[in-house]
């Protein structure tokens, strides 16, 4: 949703970070992914709490190797060292200065700064911080272990406040390293989207 919040959630190793970078690359280059990403190009910013710039650049490079049409523009990158709310003044200024239209937060739990994710106030504070940033956002979240009904880890308010949520499922071929990804729209404030499938070749 334009100017609103979407959350993608799934277990570790389900290629959530890959997907976040891929979506950022599509927006940067104005390439549409039906049902998920608009075709109008725009600047994107990737907030990384989990890895480093070298890792992000390597992954982006692999995407471009397989899709040369995406070589024209690349997302801005920021390695995060403190909670999202604590970085708001600098982030807001940077978003305005660079004309950022799409923000990826990887990951939601780290961006909350170690607060109790089961506490509703943590979810409220997180989304309140996002609303102060003048752009559309995608947050990448984990799921609880050993549950039959996967949901965003922590308070149900992470789901309730998000305008849209997608569950990601992944199967990786151990021989080739290629991953088949399924995306399932679990919540939509306007209308639900059909499931989507992607394949990332190693």
Predicted regions and their residues:
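Pre-Walker A (Motif I) flank of P-loop NTPase domains
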Residues: 2-6, 42
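Phosphate-binding/switch region of NTP-binding enzymes
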Residues: 7-8, 13, 17-18, 102, ...
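Conserved hydrophobic/aromatic pocket- or pore-lining residues that grip, position, or stack substrates
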Residues: 8, 24, 46
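Conserved inter-motif catalytic segment of the P-loop NTP-binding fold
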Residues: 12-14, 38-121, 125-128
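Hydrophobic positions on the alpha1 helix immediately C-terminal to the Walker A/P-loop
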Residues: 19-23
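Active-site catalytic microenvironments for nucleophilic, acid-base chemistry
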Residues: 26-30
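Conserved Walker
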Residues: 31-39, 149-155
């Amino acid at each position: 949703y334009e100017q609103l919040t979407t959350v993608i959630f799934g277990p570790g190793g389900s290629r959530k970070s890959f997907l976040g970078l891929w979506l950022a690359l599509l927006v940067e280059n104005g390439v549409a992914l039906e049902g998920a990403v608009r075709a109008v190009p725009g600047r994107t910013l990737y907030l990384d709490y989990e890895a480093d710039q070298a890792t992000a650049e390597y992954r982006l490079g692999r995407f471009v190797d397989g899709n040369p049409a995406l070589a024209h523009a690349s997302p801005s990158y920021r390695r995060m060292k403190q909670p999202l709310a604590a970085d708001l003044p600098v982030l807001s200024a940077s978003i305005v200065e660079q004309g950022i239209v799409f923000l990826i937060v990887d990951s939601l739990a780290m961006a909350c700064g170690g607060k109790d994710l089961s506490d509703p106030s943590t979810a409220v504070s997180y989304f309140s911080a996002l609303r102060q940033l003048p752009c559309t956002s995608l947050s990448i979240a984990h799921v609880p272990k050993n549950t039959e009904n996967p949901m965003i880890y922590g308070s149900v308010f992470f789901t309730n406040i998000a305008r849209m949520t997608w569950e990601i499922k992944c199967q990786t071929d151990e021989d080739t390293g290629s991953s088949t990804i399924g995306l399932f729209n679990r919540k939509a404030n306007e209308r639900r989207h059909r499931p989507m499938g992607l394949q990332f070749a190693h």
